[in-house]
Amino acid sequence: MPKYDMRDKIRRMSIIVYMLQKKEYNIHQIRDKMNYIMDKEWSKSIIEKDIAQLRDDFDCPIERVGNKLRIIEPYSFVNQIQQWVEFYI
């Protein structure tokens, strides 16, 4: 199994936030678009872990709408990362 670095994680999370701010997607659609955009094969479980971390650590308002996910209120991933870094500095 390849080792994933923080840059890939931040890229994946950025893509997830961007996609879910635009429209609703299910986890399989997110994974397919992620794999296409990043030209890598990410598993469903990796994407689910990223979504959980966005919710838990970065206070991302991801909500389930039927069988799809969506960010339903304004959200800035960059601001959340800055706050997270400032907390540890």
Give the location of each predicted region.
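Short, basic/aromatic recognition patches that contact phosphate-bearing ligands
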Residues: 1-88
